[in-house]
Amino acid sequence: MQQSVIALLKELRAYALEKSLRAAIYYHEEDSYLMRFANSAISLNTNEHLVRLQISVYDGNKHADYEMIADPNQIEPLKRGIDTAAEMASRAQALSYTPSIPCYRETVIDMQAYDPFLAGITNPERLEFFNTLARGLETETIKLSGVFSNGTTITAQISTESEHTQYFACTDASITAVLSHQKLKWEVNALQSAQAKTELNPERLRAELAFLVRQYSENPAVQLPLGKYTVVFGAAAVGDVLDMFNWVGPNGGMMKRGYSFLKEEQIGQPVFSPRFTLTDDPRCQATYPVSHDLTGKRRERFPLFEAGVLKAFFWSQDDADEFGREATGHSVYHN
């Protein structure tokens, strides 16, 4: 698969060079599947295969991006996309800084986060997963709903600055299972994500749901009075908090624009509990890692907080260009 993607990018690079452009081309392909359940039955079963191309053209302090849905087998519309990006760049207002154009120093093929078995999971297997997690929990008044989604994402990059390319492939799955009482109107849910097929565990989801159903069915309802409480977050909630944290926390660009709750002078100071440590580690398979960022910078282990102490802000390349900082390998699709 990577050979055809790389060949396409090299052909588009050659066209950009023929037009005397300085450009970077980003390829993004998704092959996704979704099975949805409602009222203990399949309500939707679908899949989608999309290819998107982003073309970035640079002209000194001018820069323009153009995105398009692409058919890799139709090269002429893609070349016209390059022409459009070039025209947009020529008409763009100059920035107050000079944006860096990616220059890839080596060819990278990174499939550490790709699992062919998860990519090839079938509809009967998705159905059996849900049947297993709901076994013995459904009744006339307790109904199952939820979603099983999975897919493969391929990203690749090239620029006019070198012949080298980058290619990344990853697989992922996300499952949400909900049991709801038709009369009492309560519902409980359990979530699971996976990067490889071996991580799928319907029995664990069933155990979580069974525990919650038992609490709602056997214990009396209570209303908590106003006050201070300790709330324990599960993995999914922690993930949502960290996703928000990405924007209002140790994000260098957002900090300089005044959107972060942190300040640069707090580096080296304790800002959280000593029990809190947060590190961006591209070796951690559970985070769908990539070895290099979109600009070609090799990603390394990057401590953000250690024992509650703020260690550093991360910087994407564009933010680093704008504010005169050094990029930290965080020009990625997800942090």
Language model regions located:
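Short, compositionally biased leader-like segments
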Residues: 1-31, 247-282, 335
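Acidic low-complexity segments
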Residues: 7-14, 20-33, 76-168, 204-239
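N-terminal alpha-helical targeting/anchoring segments
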Residues: 33-90
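Short acidic, glycine/serine/threonine-rich loops at helix termini
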Residues: 35-39, 153-168, 186-192, 241-247, ...
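A cytosolic small-molecule/anion-sensing beta-strand core signal
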Residues: 59, 219, 223, 306
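Extended amphipathic alpha-helical scaffolds
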Residues: 124-203, 234, 252-279
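Dual-mode signal for accessory low-complexity, basic/Gly-rich regions
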Residues: 266-335
